[in-house]
Amino acid sequence: MVSKTFCSSPFVCTRQNAYDRISPCAFGPIEVDVPMGTTQADRWMHPDLTSLRNKFLNGDRPSECKRCWDEEDAGIQSLRQRTNEAYGTDITDWESGPREIVIKTTNVCNLACRSCAGWDTSLYWPEGEYYTNKYNTTKIDRSGNKVPGNDFMQWRPKVYHSSDLWTPADLRNVKKISFFGGEPLLDKQHGKLLQKVIDAGKANVTTLFYSTNCQQIGKHYEELWSQFKRVEIFFSIDGIEKQFEYLRWPGNWEKTKTNIDWFLNLPNRYPNVDWYFQGSQCVSVLNIAEYNHTAEWLEDK
């Protein structure tokens, strides 16, 4: 009998970023550094991920998964529960590869949002360098040493997730691929992975998910998207008009509206795809008073 604390995520999902870090789910309860060039098969069977799987098989409630436990204790449906509903808990043949792939494609972004920082947008880096030079700010690096820097900066260069390591065998179980950034639509290399899924004959059973800031359209990918079962586009909109441009600097509201309309017209051009669109707000003290106003605008779209 499956434990009531069981989570199927480590058995069905892999999250990867452009820095060669892997994790068992979208929330990243643990992040494991792997050498560049490590095969997807070796990433999937990494000992640290297997250790977490064994904890769930033994009926444990791993402390690494604190976010889900806290949400459940507060009466909120957690990612663990949603994943169990989506994939079930009778997991077989999991060793052959993931069903769901979550990729943080890049740290490159064309916005410096108030809710973000340097690890997810390269546009913050010049500001971080300014603070370091003017105020001598410091941070702790990955070796535990104090070095010049702050959370607006990254020691890594601009990087993109490599699609070259994925083989047809790695994709044999895939049902969903989610793309986050940075800004995933700025990463043209991820189109290689889409083509590999198509070539593997899996596109017609695979859902694609994107979280986009709406500052660009998907003209480079629409022909690829047209071959997939379902495409989900989440628009990151924390406010409208002047509030949007403040919270998501240097975003342009008129351009944002035009681009959203472009996305919403995709079902007319590709009616065989199951399209899904949703607005997504990052709520903070900066926008909570206008939350309903923004939500109403999104509903009207």
Annotate each language-model stretch with its function.
Residues 1-86:
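Accessory C-terminal segments flanking Radical SAM cores
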Residues 6-19, 91-119, 175-178:
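N-terminal pre-triad scaffold of radical SAM enzymes
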Residues 69-71, 116-122:
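Detector for the c-type heme attachment site
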Residues 73-100, 109-111, 132:
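Recognition helices and adjacent regulatory flanks at domain boundaries
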Residues 98-108, 119-161, 172-188, 200-219, ...:
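Core AdoMet radical
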Residues 189-195, 218-225, 290-292:
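Distinct, well-ordered alpha-helical segments
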Residues 223-230, 267-268, 299:
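Acidic (Asp/Glu)-rich catalytic clusters
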Residues 285-300:
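Catalytic cores of alpha/beta
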